[in-house]
Structures are given as C-alpha cells and as structure tokens.
Amino acid sequence: VIADEFNLDKISVENCAMAGRSARTFLDEGRWDKVYEALQPGDFVLIQFGHNDAGAINTGKARAELRGSGEESKVFLMEKTGKYQVVYTFGWYLRKFIMDAQEKGAIPIVLSHTPRNKWKDGKIERNTDSFGKWTREAAEATGAYFIDLNKISADKLEKKGIEKTAAYYLSLIHI
C-alpha cells in the first residue's frame, strides 16, 4: 500500500513486514537478518512495531518483549520449545534495528504504530505512554527520524468520527 505513495520510476519499495510479528519475533525468525543483508547505503528503512509486542513473553504466542526502552534483559524458559531465551526491552530491539541500518549507511525512519479502533468519550485512544513513547525514545537515542503516525492517524480518524473510522479496520467476526 505504501508503494502507491511513491514514484516507482525513481525508487523501489520492498515491504518486508510480516503480520503478527513483534520486534522480538521479527529478529528471532531471521527476518531482520534478511533486511540487514540487503541494505545499501542511502536506503530508507521504515521501522514500525508495537501492535503485536504486548502479551505473553514465554507462553502462548510468546512474542512480547520486556516493557520499556532501557537496556534490561531477562532469561525466560520458553514453554513451546523448552529452551531458555534472553529477552530484551521493546526499545532495545528498535535500537538494534536502527543502529544496524545506520551501520550499513541506510536511513532509518521510525514510526509509532497506528491506533487501534478503541474510543472513549469521542476520542480514539492514543499510545503515548508505552509503545509510542518507547518508539520515540529509541529514535531520539539513536538520532533516527521519527514520525508519530499514532498521533497523525488518530487526529485524522477523530475528524472522521467513530462510524466512518470503522471502515479502516478489519472485522474479526469471521476470523
């Protein structure tokens, strides 16, 4: 979809995102390694996580990170594999992606995640106190560009209102 916004005669867009991935699982599954290997100096790398980064760390889907943007890590026994894994903060994973891109001479652009379709008192819920905040902090700590897509999207959706906004969100009734 984002490719529609660019002149494809001048640039190429490669969407390496995978539904349902957190920053941690994107790294663990080797998806970031493929991006990293393909990076060339001057490439723009848009980095956005946060929708799938909450929840269980070592049970069920086991894709969450430690909350926060610090350097903390903790070892967990993974229920699914029976193996131990070091898990870092959400911000640690973002900083890794950003610094890796910078190391290759690429230009990382970090985006806060789009808001969920959750409303209270006529306002869509913003994410400024957790993943949105940690995303901004990771960008600031590394000198990367930051786009507050959560705010930009929420502002536009609020102007449209709750009823018109529903069309932009997937119905999960039949899934």
Regions found by a protein language model. Give the residues of each.
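Conserved small/polar residues in nucleotide/adenosyl-binding loops
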Residues: 173-175
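Loop/turn elements at helix/coil->beta-strand transitions in domains of secreted/extracellular proteins
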Residues: 9-12, 40-45, 103-109, 142-145
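Substrate-gating cap/lid alpha-helix
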Residues: 115-151
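Active-site segments of SGNH/GDSL-like serine hydrolases
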Residues: 95-129
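A generic structural signal for well-ordered alpha-helical segments
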Residues: 6, 101, 135-139
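Glycine-centered helix-coil hinge/cap
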Residues: 160-170
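Conserved SGNH/GDSL esterase-like catalytic core that processes O-acyl groups on lipids
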Residues: 1-95
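Short, solvent-exposed loop/turn and secondary-structure capping segments
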Residues: 26-28, 56-63, 113, 121-123, ...
